[in-house]
Amino acid sequence: MFEFNLTVPAGATHKKKIVGRGSSSGWGKTSGKGHKGQQARSGGKVYAGFEGGQMPLYRRVAKKGFSNYPFKKEFYVVNLAMLETKYSDGETVNKESLMQKGLLRKGSLYVKVLGTGDITKKLTVDVDRISASAKEKIEKAGGTIVQSEA
């Protein structure tokens, strides 16, 4: 086998600075924490946004707007160019077949087909959503669309 002589360039590594070991070390006495105060005490850090006890800005400002996050639907996108390369004429495109061909990650709930690329094969597409351009191209190639609305 090969023998490698792996050395670190000079000056690339530094010894860890030991604090609180005499004033001549540069980090003696207060160990870089300054004099007294909360930050000098053990465990004396304050969270980001802490304003010394007064009502912080993020709580003073009113909540505004609407979030649909709990009901958000994540669509996994598949393009026509991908279908053209992986599928043969007359096949059905659905979640199971997409997973078998490695186009869909496991755990993806919803699938949307977009119209990037061209398609020449007659496919039956059964997905949750489909773009207008993809629908047009699939129908032009002689394919059919079975859409379960998500």
Curated annotation (Swiss-Prot):
GO terms for molecular function: rRNA binding; structural constituent of ribosome. It comes from the Bacteria. GO terms for cellular component: cytosolic large ribosomal subunit. Residues 18-43 are annotated as: Disordered. Keywords: Ribonucleoprotein, Ribosomal protein, RNA-binding, rRNA-binding. One of its GO terms (biological process) is translation. Pfam families: Ribosomal_L27A. InterPro entries: Ribosomal_uL15, Ribosomal_uL15/eL18, Ribosomal_uL15/eL18_sf, Ribosomal_uL15_bac-type, Ribosomal_uL15_CS. Disulfide bonds: none annotated. Part of the 50S ribosomal subunit. Belongs to the universal ribosomal protein uL15 family. Binds to the 23S rRNA. This is Large ribosomal subunit protein uL15. It comes from Treponema denticola (strain ATCC 35405 / DSM 14222 / CIP 103919 / JCM 8153 / KCTC 15104).
